[in-house]
A protein has these predicted regions:
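N-terminal small-residue-enriched
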Residues: 1-132
Length: 132
């Protein structure tokens, strides 16, 4: 949806994100973790940007915990950068948890001076994504 928002009535309106969430699914988080041969469970996403013309996205998580043979390990990585082609990322979602959590309030920025409040959160997703 072509939402336009602005920081105040004195500022220019820009197309930008609002509060969009995935609907909760039916999968148990324990089953999602158990289904991963090798991967990472990511925590505390805090940054992201998109390229709407080319459908690319990049997000950052504070940390990730390695999963090996369906079990969380003691190996932490930080920070974690995720990137990819949005349609491919959405098609790769194979499990959606039955939990749902809204995490605090963040901000959507345009340049260095334009900020509006947004929220993030939702269910846990099992997805294939490029990490770097």
């Amino acid at each position: 949806s072509g939402n336009s928002r602005r920081q105040s009535y004195r500022r220019k309106a820009y197309a930008r994100m609002t509060n969009t969430f995935f609907e909760r699914g039916t999968d148990k988080l324990e089953d999602m973790i158990a289904s991963v041969r090798h991967g990472y469970m990511l925590f505390e996403t805090n940054n992201g940007m998109e390229d709407p013309k080319n459908w690319q996205i990049q997000c950052t998580a504070e940390y990730g915990i390695e999963i090996v043979d369906g079990k969380l390990t003691d190996h932490y990585v930080s920070p974690v950068v995720m990137s990819g082609f949005v349609p491919d990322l959405l098609k790769s979602i194979s499990m959606v948890s039955d939990g749902f959590e809204v995490i605090g309030a963040g901000q959507c920025g345009k340049g260095y001076k334009e900020w509006v409040r947004v929220s993030d959160g939702g269910p846990n997703l099992k997805v294939r994504v490029k990490l770097g």
